[in-house]
A protein has these predicted regions:
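Core SAM-dependent methyltransferase catalytic element
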Residues: 184-186, 190-208
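Conserved class I S-adenosyl-L-methionine
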Residues: 1-39, 140-162, 195
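Acceptor-substrate binding/catalytic loop of class I
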Residues: 159-175
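Class I SAM-dependent methyltransferase SAM/SAH-binding core
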Residues: 45, 51-99
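A conserved beta-strand element that flanks and buttresses the S-adenosyl-L-methionine
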Residues: 111
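A short glycine-rich, Lys/Arg-flanked "PGG" loop and its adjoining helix->strand segment in the class I
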Residues: 123-135
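Short catalytic micro-motifs in class I SAM-dependent methyltransferases
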Residues: 114-115
Length: 208
């Protein structure tokens, strides 16, 4: 089976170019919903930042962003994007969520866009996110819920994940994902489906 890092390194080569008008709109909606929960003094952890599409939108609205991705090539593209746009308050690092350099209670906001459906140990990931947030910190996520209804995208990802050509994929239903976030110690503040097929659930939550 292909590793997560190798898979996302490969996807990085034309990731931005493959986002069609529909997905581009979903990213725009994600950014719009996110900005409503950001404050000028916030320190943000952008978990699985990818090529930095949403990171770039967040940057002018907060004090500092630590953007991380398991893929060194995704991280490199995000870093270059920040340089190209003159962004100086974003630090991009190739690492994972469990890097001990990320200290508990050190972030006002953690964002996780289009990544929760690709993590196999979701309980551990959500617990780690909670630990990294300051008391009352906000967790903002957008996740494909491939189990909500049958779609071509879902079938394709199921086949690829079961034949080893892409890593693990979770098939959440929207209510199931919302419940998992709540059970991890968060109060759900807002939920909205941003995309028809597959459903892409935006959840704004606060650490209890």
């Amino acid at each position: 089976m292909i590793t997560e890092r190798d898979f996302w390194n490969h996807r990085s080569h034309n990731y931005d170019e493959q986002i069609g008008p529909q997905y581009e709109r979903a990213y725009q909606l994600t950014a719009e919903r996110t900005l409503a929960y950001l404050k000028p003094e916030d320190r943000v952890l952008d978990f699985a930042c990818g090529t930095g599409i949403v990171t770039l939108e967040e940057a002018p609205h907060v004090k500092y962003i630590r953007a991380i991705d398991i893929s060194d090539e995704m991280a490199a593209k995000a870093k270059q994007k920040m340089i190209d746009h003159g962004v100086t308050n974003v630090e991009v690092t190739q690492t994972d969520l469990f890097d001990p350099c990320l200290e508990p209670d050190s972030f006002d906001v953690v964002t996780a866009f289009n990544v929760l459906c690709y993590v196999e140990n979701s309980d551990a990931v959500l617990a780690r996110i909670k630990s990294l947030l300051k008391p009352g910190g906000r967790f903002l996520s957008a996740t494909d819920c491939l189990g909500e209804k049958l779609t071509k995208v879902g079938v394709k990802k199921w086949f690829k994940s079961h034949t080893g050509s892409m890593p693990y994929v979770a098939f959440y239903k929207m209510k199931e994902l919302e419940r998992r976030i709540a059970d991890a110690g968060f109060t759900v503040l807002e939920r909205e489906n941003l995309f028809p097929a597959p459903p892409n659930l935006f959840v704004a939550a606060q650490k209890k």
